């Protein structure tokens, strides 16, 4: 199966800071990771968007 591109958006400001590749098979939940947001200048929760 092919990989699809997705981005990780900051939960606080909504800025899309990171891009990742995910499998194309459907999954019930989306990825949530604590990463550094350049806009907020702190570590925040980032959620997967497509």
Curated annotation (Swiss-Prot):
A cellular-component GO term for this protein: ribonucleoprotein complex
Q: List the disulfide bonds.
A: none
Q: Name one Pfam family in it.
A: Ribosomal_L33
- Keyword vocabulary terms for this entry: Ribonucleoprotein, Ribosomal protein
GO biological process per UniProt: translation
Q: Kindly give the InterPro entries that the UniProt entry links to this protein.
A: Ribosomal_bL33, Ribosomal_bL33_sf, Ribosomal_zn-bd
Tell me the GO molecular function terms.
structural constituent of ribosome
Family per UniProt?
Answer: Belongs to the bacterial ribosomal protein bL33 family.
Q: What name has this protein been given in UniProt?
A: Large ribosomal subunit protein bL33A
Species of origin reads Streptococcus thermophilus (strain ATCC BAA-250 / LMG 18311)
Q: What is the lineage of its organism?
A: Bacteria, Bacillati, Bacillota, Bacilli, Lactobacillales
Q: Tell me the name of the encoding gene.
A: rpmG1
């Amino acid at each position: 199966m092919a990989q699809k591109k997705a981005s990780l958006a900051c939960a606080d400001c909504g800025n899309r800071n990171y891009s990742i590749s995910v499998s194309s098979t459907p999954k019930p939940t989306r990825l949530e990771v604590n990463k550094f947001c350049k806009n907020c200048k702190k570590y925040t929760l980032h959620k997967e968007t497509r």
